[in-house]
Amino acid sequence: MKFRKTRIDDIQDVIEIINGAKNYFKEEDIDQWQKGYPNEKTIIKDIEEQRGYVLEKEEKVIATVALTFGGDPVYDTIYHGEWLSEEEYAVIRRVAVSGEYKRKGVSTKLISNIEKICIENNITNIKIVTHKKNIPMQNMLKKNNFKYCGIIYLEDGSERLAFEKII
């Protein structure tokens, strides 16, 4: 498998994977990614800002993720817990895996590659949030040694479970 930056010619593959995740969330009654986000505009911005990544298998895009540095004001206030560290951190966003590759260790492969990028950028803290009903994501995070830290609220007021890992 090859982990690399997302390119413009990947947009349709990435959108297809994200739409698959949106459909899964809808079927499972998970109110995440149900209001038009993320969309093509989001992916283009990720590409332009060099924060979008894909995982390929045999030249086919099978997963997508975004990684941002420099913090996020939404993460400043955490409820019913606390972050593991106050150090500078990276945020993992928009993790999605093609349906045919779910439960095959692909998300773990994404995480290990993200950790390498963080280390290269002298960042040892990684944060991520997910919906309370997104049990597969919570399980993947725990499997990859992320610790549950508490609850944050997105700009639209949506509640998310917050996780952090120190690498």
Task: Spell out what each predicted region is.
Residues 66-94, 102:
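Conserved acyl-donor/pantetheine-binding loop and adjacent beta-alpha core of acyl/acetyltransferases
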Residues 94-97, 103-116, 139-143:
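Conserved acetyl-CoA-binding loop-helix of GNAT-fold acetyltransferases
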Residues 111, 118-130:
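Conserved GNAT acetyl-CoA-binding A-motif
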Residues 108, 120, 132-150:
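Conserved active-site alpha-helix within GNAT-family acetyltransferase domains
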